[in-house]
Amino acid sequence: MSQSQFDPYVQNGGTTVAIAGDGFAILAGDTRSVNGYNINTRFQPRVHEVGDDLVIGASGFEADALALVKRIQQRIDLYHDNHERKMSAQSCACMVRTLLYGKRFFPYYVYTTVAGIDKEGKGEIYSFDPVGSYEREWCRAGGSAANFITPFLDNQVNLHNQYVPGSHGKERKPRRLLKLEEAMKITTDAFTSAGERHIEVGDSVLVKIITKEGVETRIIPLKKD
């Protein structure tokens, strides 16, 4: 006897990488959208400008991702009407938390990241789980290839288990905020390597670079197969 099941979610792939640096934040996402072994489209953005020099990264179930980004944009517009000022990245993160937590019984199947610039001019990265728990981080990989990219970021950005030469394992290497070109090279290498190992990563990477001057967009080509 067969039993019908309700499964409203689809994994459409998508991987995002975020790095906070000295005077900038990078949020990048690959553009391949899949359903199993089928490619739906080769250009589906996973990073979205929502105004106020804020960028949202959303990957996972594409319908939920687009719905969440639309709700965030609506909330930012409402914030402008009520307060007549720009929304900060920290305020945006708190708002996204309430949106995700409010849907906790039927959550958005999305890996969400918020990127912006703080009051001191440093990059801000906030990463979320599907029900709203979040934290500020130096870097974060989310989505289908996160397991491949996270160890690379831990090594190159977080400097996990790395020590000052000659200290005999007693003095850890201090973390530092990266320069823009350093972060861009790490981002490019991360997606290039993931594309060689994961079938859901490919086609191109859409990169949003947030600075105090605004948001710059770059596209990095990836393999098409």
From Swiss-Prot:
Protein's UniProt keywords contain Iron-sulfur: no
Chief location of this protein within or outside the cell: cytoplasm
CDD domains: proteasome_beta_type_1 (cd03757)
Subcellular locations according to the entry: Cytoplasm; Nucleus
Lineage top rank: taxon: Eukaryota
Entry keyword set: Cytoplasm, Nucleus, Proteasome
Assembly description: The 26S proteasome consists of a 20S proteasome core and two 19S regulatory subunits. The 20S proteasome core is composed of 28 subunits that are arranged in four stacked rings, resulting in a barrel-shaped structure. The two end rings are each formed by seven alpha subunits, and the two central rings are each formed by seven beta subunits. The catalytic chamber with the active sites is on the inside of the barrel.
Function: Non-catalytic component of the proteasome, a multicatalytic proteinase complex which is characterized by its ability to cleave peptides with Arg, Phe, Tyr, Leu, and Glu adjacent to the leaving group at neutral or slightly basic pH. The proteasome has an ATP-dependent proteolytic activity.
Family indicated by similarity: Belongs to the peptidase T1B family.
Name by which UniProt lists this protein: Probable proteasome subunit beta type-6
Native source species: Schizosaccharomyces pombe (strain 972 / ATCC 24843) (Fission yeast)
